[in-house]
Design a protein with these regions (language model features):
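Periplasmic/cell-envelope proteins involved in peptidoglycan metabolism and beta-lactam response
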Residues: 1-218
Length: 218
């Protein structure tokens, strides 16, 4: 739909800007200390480092927590570039996870290969894209109305001409719209990645075993 195309156009433009910024921090001559980055950029690099850990590229068990550079990274006084280069030098990085045919022996080549891996990964990573969308929404670049209408465009909600018209004319706010859909379980917490996604509770009389209450969601 036109609405989907408009949102994707906004996202694609912002994504290219973000990827360029990440590349500059990883490969540029003057990378910024993590602590001096804005909240958005910190979120991107926190995600990148966490992904390297989860994929066992940055080996948590190998990291020396007393290492001076590691502690500087934890305190935000050095850049991701410096931290990752140091991690390579200290053998905290498993290079077999991202090198293919060529045997890398030079630390610069290893770092370049790691950067290429990171950039290829985040360019298609859903979790990373969600962070971009989060800040687009916070900045108002993508509106709540657009997101609500996309729920119809993508079949998450059954087509309802009256409700769509209300959204388009601003007769109903996106917040009120979503609250109503969640209340009626047309949209579940699980779809919004909210906890609890499901749950149940059973209350009995401990003396008699009598069932007093039973409830579940959804």
């Amino acid at each position: 739909t036109e609405n989907e195309k408009a949102v994707m156009h906004i996202f694609s433009g912002r994504q290219q800007t973000v990827l360029s910024s990440v590349t500059s921090e990883l490969k540029g001559a003057s990378p910024a200390a993590f602590g001096s980055l804005g909240e958005e950029d910190q979120d991107y690099f926190t995600y990148i480092i966490n992904q390297l850990k989860e994929k066992k590229i940055l080996l948590q068990k190998s990291i020396d927590k007393t290492d001076e550079v590691y502690q500087e990274w934890q305190s935000g006084t050095i850049s991701a570039q410096e931290y990752l280069n140091h991690a390579i030098a200290q053998n905290w990085i498993d290079i077999t996870q991202f090198t293919i045919d060529e045997k890398y022996s030079d630390s610069t080549e290893i770092y370049d290969a790691l950067c290429d891996y990171i950039m290829d990964d985040i360019a298609t990573d859903t979790g990373f894209s969600k962070i971009i969308y989060e800040y687009l929404i916070k900045a108002g670049s993508v509106s709540g109305k657009q997101l609500c209408l996309i729920l119809y465009d993508q079949g998450v909600l059954a087509y309802d001409a009256e409700e769509i018209s209300s959204l388009e004319s601003n007769a109903v706010s996106p917040v009120s719209f979503l609250k109503d859909k969640i209340k009626n379980i047309e949209i579940t917490p699980a779809q919004l990645a909210l906890d609890p996604c499901s749950g149940s509770c059973v209350i009995t009389d401990v003396k008699t075993g009598e069932l007093l209450a039973l409830v579940s969601y959804p």
